[in-house]
Amino acid sequence: MEGAHLAWELAHAVLLLSLIPAGGSVPHEESSLVVNKGEELRLKCNEEGPVTWNFQNSDPSAKTRISNEKEWHTKNATIRDIGRYECKSKGSIVNSFYVFVKDPNVLFLVDSLIYGKEDSDILLVCPLTDPDVLNFTLRKCDGKPLPKNMTFIPNPQKGIIIKNVQRSFKGCYQCLAKHNGVEKISEHIFLNVRPVHKALPVITLSKSYELLKEGEEFEVTCIITDVDSSVKASWISYKSAIVTSKSRNLGDYGYERKLTLNIRSVGVNDSGEFTCQAENPFGKTNATVTLKALAKGFVRLFATMNTTIDINAGQNGNLTVEYEAYPKPKEEVWMYMNETLQNSSDHYVKFKTVGNNSYTSELHLTRLKGTEGGIYTFFVSNSDASSSVTFNVYVKTKPEILTLDMLGNDILQCVATGFPAPTIYWYFCPGTEQRCLDSPTISPMDVKVSYTNSSVPSFERILVESTVNASMFKSTGTICCEASSNGDKSSVFFNFAIKEQIRTHTLFTPLLIAFGVAAGLMCIIVMILVYIYLQKPKYEVQWKVVEEINGNNYVYIDPTQLPYDHKWEFPRNRLSFGKTLGAGAFGKVVEATAYGLFKSDAAMTVAVKMLKPSAHLTEREALMSELKVLSYLGNHINIVNLLGACTIGGPTLVITEYCCYGDLLNFLRRKRDSFICPKHEEHAEAAVYENLLHQAEPTADAVNEYMDMKPGVSYAVPPKADKKRPVKSGSYTDQDVTLSMLEDDELALDVEDLLSFSYQVAKGMSFLASKNCIHRDLAARNILLTHGRITKICDFGLARDIRNDSNYVVKGNARLPVKWMAPESIFNCVYTFESDVWSYGILLWELFSLGSSPYPGMPVDSKFYKMIKEGYRMFSPECSPPEMYDIMKSCWDADPLQRPTFKQIVQLIEQQLSDNAPRVYANFSTPPSTQGNATDHSVRINSVGSSASSTQPLLVREDV
């Protein structure tokens, strides 16, 4: 059957060829012929005259076969015979055939590597051996979708024609078709797309400008990027320059060439522009770098502000200088009155590089004082040059009248000071008046202006003296001296009476002598009273809030600058006062009932802090500062929280939480006889210990030698059931509170309670540290205890009579708790978070010694100071767990930076709680809303100066 089919095909081919008329003038018509592999192929051209046969197939490496025979004959057809056959006569195609040779094993004739040009059509060579197929198409080798913008035309005789090839078409493809119901896939065809230049090359220079000195090396790199390596690039030739080149491919369609131009030693004549140029078929581009070679370096200063500056006292000021320098500056300093300034809390310097060889320097002056006016100089230099600029800073201060006195010869003198120099005006009005400013001014007799140093402009406050002759006034009256400067005014009044002068005949009469002696004695008495008053301790808020000034340096924030929110105001008529809880030299704390503090119909017991009638202005300001500090801190379960205040319509009242058990120190001493110590509990039934309540504390005066620091402890062991406390949740009613108070007060005290107290105080101090607040007087006497045995940190301040408290030692005009103070606080007047940690260690010793005084038997004298300096520390209290004594010792580290933070102490004690009594702290867990976000105060304070009234170290060298 195959032979018969072939014979029919050949006859059909011969018939078609023989139909072409002679001459070849009729346009040919292409036909296709399909034969099987191994069959005979015979094609005959019946054209008169000579003919030529041409054969072309899909193999690009195969040469076109030409034959001059009338007949084309192939005995054994193979897939290599697949192609187009053309019969030509006299150069014209008479007819053509495309012959398919079916091979059951091969459906596609594939060219595995194809190169195409971007934006052109490309043929993926995969012609078919058998045209009888379905769904002749294209796919990617990895099975991923074809590019979205790809369009192609399948051609059984040629393959797949892809239109408008793009760079993204690059990849591996396969032709596929359905043949005899089976999908056939070709071998891999790799398509490479040669990019077309659509833009100029991109040139990037390593620098656009270079400033050098003679003899220095100049090097600049030109980076050219393009789609392929056909790009041309070069530096425009310079005789003294050396150019090196490097190149690399950047992916499929990226190419980079680096041309580095180098001049080993530049000269002034090398100054100019250097151009790098690049070219591709799209066009040319270039970039230029400028070189400026100098014979010598330079420094140029530009003052961006007026060099004469007026600043009000208390305000911040900035001095800014811009400058250019080459080479780079070696020295950049700010000087004040020819002395170099170092960064401190009062001033700090910021340097910044703003560009090539361009710099700025800023001197920040913080809260300028009247004494900080003067000449500020900025000096900058390098190896070749130097320059400086000077600023004259004048600090304006308000005028102040120092004296208004009657001199001899009826001369009245008024002395005022301020900057700039104040102008003094005199006013007179008859009679005794409180103001005379509406009266006409009086011309002074003489005005003198005094400067600190007359040879240079004065930057400090200027003294102005003005005098008038009181004899010009014919009647008794009031004279006013007013000093005015920059709109600020200060005035003082002087009342005088015109009296008839009585001329005495004897100067030194007995009466005059007696009067002189009495006046002298009176002056001495007044001086003694003034001295006593100055030695009287001033009330001051112990809690101090700090702020960061520069890096790790901090200063105290003036509490008067803290805001006060009037939402804390509470009506005075809703307070009903009760008994006095505590009293001091300046004020007192009174128990009170507040009606409608949180609910309109509810009464609540509170503590109200107030001043005594004898308090002065400084004490009133201090109480207001304490109120502002409490409102700034916010609420926490372990501090005495602010509930309200009365600041309007009467004396200031500060309303805080009421703590029913008083201070922790006295609570511990009350519970000594019922304390349960684990070290003695198992022997409690066999031994009776001396009651600690009857054990007298040794006085400081009675002990001169070293004493063992372990206090004696006695116990009264209650039954185990007595230690079980009910756990309450939710809010307390009045009855609940009363019952809770009775239950807590009757319960015995054990180590778990002491751990709980230690933990709560550490939590409270961690909260204060997170608020940048330093306590400065942390001790058991300053910890209050309320129902549920919850401890609360407080500052008694005005409500403690420190004059009669032996814990406070007199130093200067201050009374300080020396035995609770860290060495740096004693010797350097430095109060930090770390000094609070030291005091906390002393408090732990108080706790586990059940209220004993620290350093028992040791008076605070030069020997005590010397022992502290040499590293003496107290022994462990008898009932202290070893872990708690380890915490005490770490708190007493001589290096403040080696002491733990309060957050770390909280974590250490939590381990003790979890190991011994997991339920201890469960009764007084605090809702998250009131805990605050207490974070570890990881930033250590380098130096915080005490703002206490005593600014000198407690121990001078002679005391040791």
UniProtKB/Swiss-Prot annotation:
Which sites does the entry annotate for glycosylation? 76, 135, 149, 269, 286, 306, 318, 338, 343, 356, 453, 469
What is its membrane topology? Single-pass type I membrane protein
Group of enzyme by EC: transferase
| GO molecular function list | ATP binding; cytokine binding; growth factor binding; metal ion binding; protease binding; protein homodimerization activity; SH2 domain binding; stem cell factor receptor activity
Residues at the active site: 777 (proton acceptor)
Q: Which segments constitute the Ig-like C2-type domain?
A: 27-102, 111-194, 201-294, 303-396, 399-497
Give the stretches traversing the membrane: 512-532
Extracellular side residue ranges read 25-511
Q: Which reaction does it catalyse?
A: L-tyrosyl-[protein] + ATP = O-phospho-L-tyrosyl-[protein] + ADP + H(+)
State which ranges are Cytoplasmic (membrane side): 533-960
* Tissue/organ expression: High in the brain and testes and also present in the bursa of Fabricus, heart, kidney, lung, spleen thymus and ovary.
User: Per the record, GO CC terms?
Assistant: cell-cell junction; external side of plasma membrane; extracellular space; fibrillar center; plasma membrane; receptor complex
CDD domains reported in the protein's UniProt record:
IgI_4_SCFR (cd05860), PTKc_Kit (cd05104)
Q: Which residues does UniProt call coiled coil? A: none
Q: Which family does it belong to?
A: Belongs to the protein kinase superfamily. Tyr protein kinase family. CSF-1/PDGF receptor subfamily.
Name-wise, this protein is Mast/stem cell growth factor receptor Kit
